[in-house]
Regions:
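Non-Sec secretion/translocation targeting segments of pathogen effectors
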Residues: 2, 124, 237-239
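Generic alpha-helical structural element
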Residues: 13, 17, 74, 88, ...
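Hydrophobic (often cysteine-bearing) scaffold residues that line and stabilize catalytic clefts
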Residues: 13, 17-20, 78, 82, ...
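Active-site recognition of the HExxH zinc-binding catalytic motif
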Residues: 79-96, 121, 125, 129
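Post-HExxH zinc-binding segment in Zn-dependent metallohydrolases
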Residues: 102-152
Length: 239
């Protein structure tokens, strides 16, 4: 099932990587319903993996999954593979635009417009940590807290992620808030993530970051309150 390029380092490395691939697939099948694994199964069938030496890998991360070509480039012996395989597992390559998990990419002339990449990356980190004990990037702590709160409010968040269903998530959030508020919430997660990934948050960014964080947290509290209120009203009507 798993295809390795001619650039593999040696049989030992290849065997270790093969074990990681099997560990990933088994864990996903144990954890999630089969209906949520259609993209994983489709993409694993045609996945190509390139194991590279560090001097050949000109990229700030230790692994990278290409959504369009369904190729994974990774440094030898690195557990970042689990994060990237989660990206693979929710990559809808049949869509004319690239939809991967909660992230949407639209090509407009020479530019690529993205939306909800922050939510997608953070939730991928959360799942990689939960399922495979991958350490979460410490610079994204606050955004992780917000997305964990979101997960508590949206019970089927893992299923929406694996089925690349951002639309359904927005509709769910809009049941108790407005559509614009829901889209703003997702956009603000993007902004927070972008600031956090700078690693060195400049002094002038701190106030902006704090304001965006408070606004994003308020949205979640507002959603929870309005949902609880509506559910309580329904219960009272049944009495």
């Amino acid at each position: 099932m798993f295809k390795f390029s001619e650039e593999k380092i040696n049989n030992l490395t290849s065997e270790k990587l093969q074990n990681k691939m099997e560990t990933f697939k088994n864990k996903m099948e144990e954890t999630f319903d089969n209906k949520d694994l259609k993209y994983m199964n489709d993409n694993l069938e045609t996945l190509r993996i390139f194991i590279l030496k560090s001097k050949l890998f000109q990229y700030p991360y230790k692994a990278m999954y290409n959504n369009l070509s369904n190729e994974l480039m990774i440094l030898e012996e690195d557990d970042t593979i689990y994060h990237e395989l989660l990206h693979l597992s929710c990559n809808n390559r049949k869509n004319k635009n690239t939809i991967r998990g909660f992230a949407h990419y639209t090509k407009k002339q020479k530019n690529i417009l993205s939306f909800s990449t922050g939510l997608d990356e953070v939730y991928t980190e959360i799942l990689a940590n939960r399922l495979f004990n991958k350490e979460i990037n410490t610079t994204t702590t606050k955004t992780v807290e917000l997305v964990l709160l979101l997960e508590q409010l949206i019970n089927n968040l893992p299923s929406l992620y694996l089925n690349s269903d951002l639309y359904e998530l927005v509709l769910e959030l809009s049941k108790y808030t407005s559509l614009n508020e829901s889209l703003d919430f997702i956009y603000n997660i993007d902004r927070l993530f972008e600031i956090e990934m700078k690693n060195n948050i400049r002094k002038r960014d701190k106030e902006k970051y704090r304001a965006i964080y408070q606004k994003t947290l308020y949205f979640l509290k507002q959603y929870q309150y309005k949902r609880n209120y509506q559910e309580q009203k329904k219960k009272l009507k049944l009495l």
